[in-house]
Amino acid sequence: TMEDKKLPEKVILMYDAVIGMLEDGIDLNQMKVIDITKRAGIGKGTAYEYVSSKEELIVGALLYDIQKQFERIIGVITATDGFQSKVERILDWILDNFRECKTFALFARIGMGTYDISEHLQNEMRKAHTKECCVTNTLEQVVDEILECGVKEGILKPVKKELQRMAFGSQILI
């Protein structure tokens, strides 16, 4: 988990500031380091002790927030038995936490190319994507657990995991 990495408190403050700005409707492309650090209650120069660019900070914040959400949903899924119950719990969780799912939806839109971002931000997203992305692994883990449950119960056919993931994801995100 991301908490295992023990992020410095000031990094968490900056990440929370970015997420708060997103929740307030501020576009990623309009965010400035000075506004992020002011909201986080730290000096602008402090940001550059931890990150090399605004884009690295924004992408880090998105990944951090998504990882937190996934850790919560994994808790919900693993505490639930049965395919139908797991799917219902996910849908309930999404409805109950819709505001908090904003980052995930934004991240998905960026990944699918339906949200315009600056070239610098695109480059940072690519860098984050090429690293072993724990967010993707966590999402696959959650989806695979649900799908395996569906196969065991005879609700789903045992087909390629990639196809199952795509079909499941498209139905949940629609």
For each feature predicted by the language model, list its residue ranges:
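Short hydrophobic/aromatic patch on the recognition helix
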Residues: 41-51
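Hydrophobic alpha-helical segments that form the core
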Residues: 96, 140-149, 157-174
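Short, basic, alpha-helical segments at the C-terminal edge of helix-turn-helix-like DNA-binding modules
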Residues: 33, 63-70
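Amphipathic alpha-helical packing segments from all-alpha helical-bundle domains
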Residues: 74-75, 115-153, 166
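Short amphipathic alpha-helical segment with a characteristic S/N-K-E followed by hydrophobic residues
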Residues: 53-58, 68-69
